[in-house]
């Protein structure tokens, strides 16, 4: 596998992965054309290829060095196979069309004022030619069908390989970023003056400061009030406040998002969704960086509570919930569904929010090729192309018309049915919250 550098790789192989590496804002805003053509990120070989064709590679992303799986070299082979098959299919289609035209001309030799060679009128020779052409068409149609089936098989293998490698890269990058953060924080915390002597250290009073990673740990020590608490999911990062639900389903829930009255605008930028916004006691989005730390520290489950203006209350429960870091565009991972509201996050093959990147009106990471779902639906969310769920949509106090840019849950009873006057249903309250999977109240 001949790869010059990461610049070439990002436009070919990683395009088959279904994701693009997010660079930092400074890189994205470089205006100098020469600087844009320069690529500091390099893909390098780590050794000789094995007999099976598996070659070890590494990506140098200063200050990171990422060791890629050996299977990475097979991506290009599969990609080329798919491209070759597509060319064959196109060629077969053209041949089929030519054969059909010839067959039509043979059936009606006088249609264009022409006769078959050596004949003055249709006869046995023409009939034989028609049968031959029909046989060729049938054979080509069969070949075309087989080629399409082979393409489907290769695409399935490619998607499976992409998913395995994506998960491996996510875990590796997460660990590297965490280590770098720890090093930076350690350097920042070094004292400018001389360190105290050993006897001075021993004489200092011992101060105990307990760290709680999430609301479930507060529940474990006896806290029962639904209130604001300070958590530290990862000691190497700063602590922050969260709202804890200590009542729903035995309590211990860390609330990630709440909608209750429309007091907070959710049409926000990438930066806003990154750090969080709103009032933790009313309406808010906790922040993608914080959600990442919370879901990284423990295996979490997700509960979504919804209530419409008719007083109907339903919920959705997912037995796994994880959000990747910003480098991987806050990619969503959800587990199996249970509940009463329906599985809108995995509605169908074309509307599946699992494993999708986060999109905002100013940052398009969705799978819709003709535009930005975040801009069209006025919110930040894990859009597919585009949605079967969007809990960050606009808050409407009643049914509304026009674009379905309000809070939406596609499996809600009657929500997809035609409403008189073209009105669309809205939601009164929504809440997203997480808790450790093995939590025992």
Curated annotation (Swiss-Prot):
Pfam family, one: Fibrinogen_C
One of the record's GO molecular function terms: peptidase activator activity
Keyword match rRNA-binding: no
Main location, first listed in the record: secreted
Domain Fibrinogen C-terminal: 206-438
Keyword terms of this UniProt record: Coiled coil, Disulfide bond, Glycoprotein, Secreted, Signal
Coiled-coil ranges (or none): 73-167
Positions glycosylated per UniProt: 25, 179, 237, 265, 338
Cellular component, GO annotation: cell surface; collagen-containing extracellular matrix; extracellular space
Subunit structure as annotated in this protein's UniProt entry: Homotetramer; disulfide-linked.
Protein name per the record: Fibroleukin
Name of encoding gene: FGL2
């Amino acid at each position: 596998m001949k790869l010059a550098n990461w610049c070439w790789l990002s436009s070919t192989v990683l395009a088959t992965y279904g994701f693009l590496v997010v660079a930092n804002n400074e890189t994205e805003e470089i205006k100098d054309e020469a600087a844009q053509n320069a690529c500091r990120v390099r893909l390098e070989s780590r050794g000789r290829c094995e007999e099976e064709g598996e070659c070890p590679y590494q990506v140098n992303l200063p200050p990171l060095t990422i060791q890629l799986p050996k299977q990475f070299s097979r991506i290009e082979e599969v990609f080329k196979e798919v491209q070759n098959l597509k060319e064959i299919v196109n060629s077969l289609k053209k041949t089929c069309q030519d054969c059909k035209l010839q067959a039509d001309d043979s059936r009606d030799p006088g249609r264009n004022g022409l006769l078959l060679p050596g004949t003055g009128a249709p006869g046995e020779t023409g009939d034989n030619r028609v049968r031959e052409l029909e046989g060729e068409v049938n054979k080509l149609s069969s070949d075309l069908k087989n080629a399409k089936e082979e393409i489907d098989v290769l695409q399935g293998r490619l998607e499976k390989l992409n998913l395995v490698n994506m998960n491996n890269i996510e875990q590796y990058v997460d660990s590297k970023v965490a280590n770098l953060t720890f090093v930076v924080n350690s350097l920042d915390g070094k004292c400018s003056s001389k360190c105290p002597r050993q006897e001075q250290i021993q004489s200092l009073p011992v101060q105990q400061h307990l760290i709680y990673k999430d609301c479930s740990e507060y529940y474990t020590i006896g806290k029962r009030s639904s209130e604001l608490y300070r958590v530290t999911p990862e000691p190497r990062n700063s602590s922050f406040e969260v709202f804890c639900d200590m009542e729903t389903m035995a309590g211990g829930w860390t609330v990630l998002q709440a909608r209750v009255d429309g007091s907070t605008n959710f049409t926000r930028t990438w930066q806003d969704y990154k750090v969080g916004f709103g009032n933790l006691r009313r309406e808010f989005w906790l922040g993608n960086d914080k959600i990442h730390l919370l879901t990284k520290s423990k295996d979490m489950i997700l509960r979504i509570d919804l209530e419409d203006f008719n007083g109907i209350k339903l919920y959705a429960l997912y037995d796994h919930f994880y959000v990747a870091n910003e480098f991987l565009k806050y990619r969503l991972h959800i587990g199996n569904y249970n509940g009463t509201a329906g599985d809108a996050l995995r509605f169908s093959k074309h509307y599946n929010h699992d494993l999708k990147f986060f999109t905002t009106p100013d940052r398009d990471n969705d799978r819709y090729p003709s535009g930005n779902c975040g801009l069209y639906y006025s919110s930040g969310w894990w859009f597919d192309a585009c949605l079967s769920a969007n809990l960050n949509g606009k808050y409407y106090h009643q049914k509304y018309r026009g674009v379905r840019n309000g809070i939406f849950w596609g499996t809600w009873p009657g929500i997809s049915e035609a409403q008189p006057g073209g009105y669309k249903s809205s939601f009164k309250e929504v809440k997203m919250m997480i808790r450790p999977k093995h939590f025992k109240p």
